[in-house]
UniProtKB/Swiss-Prot annotation:
One of its GO terms (cellular component) is hemoglobin complex. Heterotetramer of two alpha chains and two beta chains. This is Hemoglobin subunit beta. It comes from Equus caballus. CDD domains: Hb-beta-like (cd08925). Red blood cells.
Amino acid sequence: VQLSGEEKAAVLALWDKVNEEEVGGEALGRLLVVYPWTQRFFDSFGDLSNPGAVMGNPKVKAHGKKVLHSFGEGVHHLDNLKGTFAALSELHCDKLHVDPENFRLLGNVLVVVLARHFGKDFTPELQASYQKVVAGVANALAHKYH
């Protein structure tokens, strides 16, 4: 990901304030509500029948936290995203057969959730930096597909 030193510092500073459980659960929940076809990868999660069920589902929240923790690893290794996500790329490609477009969708949902959580602190400049980061992470996760 091509970020200036200032952009990297801003991304890291915000990330240090992120509550992985809250933001991760909300981001994954929103992905499953807004793009319902993504639910097919989460059959074992129980009731995903309506937005309230999805957003209140403890398995969605737990997996969202796990997803966001992995994303945080990427935030701390922006110069080696492909290496950081190599094993997850292989898992999602070879075993889970996840459409790589879903990584882009989740990244965009994450940006929405960060904006909601951080309000005016999530400036347009910071959003631009995070859009670069989520695009880089999505590309790294899709790497095994190429």
